[in-house]
Amino acid sequence: MEPVRPVPPPGRPDPPRAGSQAAVKLARLLREAGYESLRIQERLATGEELLARSPELPSYLRRLGDADELAVLLRLLLLGVPVTRARVEEHVGDALREHLGNAGLLVPDGDAVHGAARLVPHDELLIASDHAGAAETHADHVPGVHRPSVALAHLTVRRSGERALDLCTGNGIQAILLAAHAEHVVATDVNGRALAYATFNAALNGADNIETRAGSFFEPVMGEQFDLVVANPPYVVSPESAYLFRDGGMRGDAVSELVVRGTPPSLAPGAFACVLIAWSLDPGDPAARPRRWLEGSGCDAFLLHTSTDDPIETATVWNRDLVDRPEAYADALDRWLAYYRELGIERLGYACLVLRKRADGRDGWVEALQLPRSALRPAGRHVERLFETRGRLARMAAGRALLGRRPRVVDDAVVSQDTRFSGGRWHAQALSLRLESGLPFSAELDPPTARLLRELDGSQTLEEALAAAVDDDHARDEGLALARRMLEIGFLELDDEAEGDR
């Protein structure tokens, strides 16, 4: 009978390990066996990202069977289900089986074999972590890639630089991504098991410029500066101290405050940081607490606000592993809700805070942007462009100096219009504008705005475009303000920088 949940191996295996050459060979053998995202999605008949959980385990097992190499590998390394030793020897090639064994990824158990770790493809990467579900008894559990870590990767500004820092590296995926455009990456974590996974994953993906350091938050890099910092800390506002990856052991949102206040001193002038945070949100001023944490930081910042949850939503999300144990699940929800009542928390905000260290050291601006709940996509260049445009607008001598520039609609903007059938006829709906890449912003367009956008192709000044699109001075003033706002969020871009902008 097929299992209904992952079956942990006997004992607790150490994280896998391999030298750089052996790890690269292992990755090559896995890919040759079809252990890649698209092939796996085809076999499992899913378009879902292969993240840290496999809720459809019974369905997946029945689709796979166990009579070919990829099926056996997926059972062992993705789904966490043992396979008979005979099946492993019959279907997994000798070289691959040897490399998996040498890396500690196969655990014999009588006539069965277990996968010692979960191995998941993400785009071109392979990322190992502890199997999902193993967190129930181990504080140092190392999870796989979750949606927040995907969001952080998508929102990170990726510029070439000498030194980068991955704070609270976990399984190391952010450090590996940084290694592609930084000469040297430092990855820190208080969890030694996480550092072991990060080391293995770096080798598996051919990233030989990553240095791991053990320690809490900024302690391992005190006094150092970096060209880029990313951080996925244990930001969850939690009454627990059970899991290092989730619970920071501090009261309320103190972990997020510590990381936000500690990041600017670690940034070189002009450097960027991308940090995931959570905070007790004031509905009257949602960005109040993060803005206060940034006072005196010498940074400009965009607070990319991804979601707002009530206490029950938060408690449910972070305790869903207990759903098969109803009494423990109910107790955890009650404990978390009591904690939020004690702290007076009615709403919790979640965001990626993107910082840029000012060269002049002065206090900068902080702007909150609400991101749609739709799936994020790679947007680092869009985020960087927002900083560049904001700086150029600030350098213009006067507000109306923008009238002499030649803004244009960005290449990935799309205008569309729906029609609705009602009362025996078709009715045109409002025009809408959206971006097909970068941050998933969209907006409805009224007719004057649509006319203005048609004029903004970069061939004429904004003043000329406004004169062609609207009829009176009041409408032109409104159009100027609207064009400025559309520049600030990336629907428009400016022409090449002129002398007056500097």
Where in the sequence are the language-model features?
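Acidic, low-complexity/disordered tracts enriched in E/D and polar residues
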Residues: 4-72, 111, 134, 360-454, ...
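Long, charge-rich, low-complexity alpha-helical segments
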Residues: 69-116, 154, 165, 184, ...
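Class I SAM-dependent transferase core
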Residues: 108-159
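Conserved SAM/SAH cofactor-binding pocket of Class I
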Residues: 146-231, 237, 280
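Conserved Class I SAM-dependent methyltransferase catalytic core
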Residues: 191, 252-305
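Mobile active-site "lid"/loop adjacent to the S-adenosyl-L-methionine
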Residues: 192-193, 233-258
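Flexible, glycine-/basic-rich loop-and-beta segments that form/coincide
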Residues: 311-388
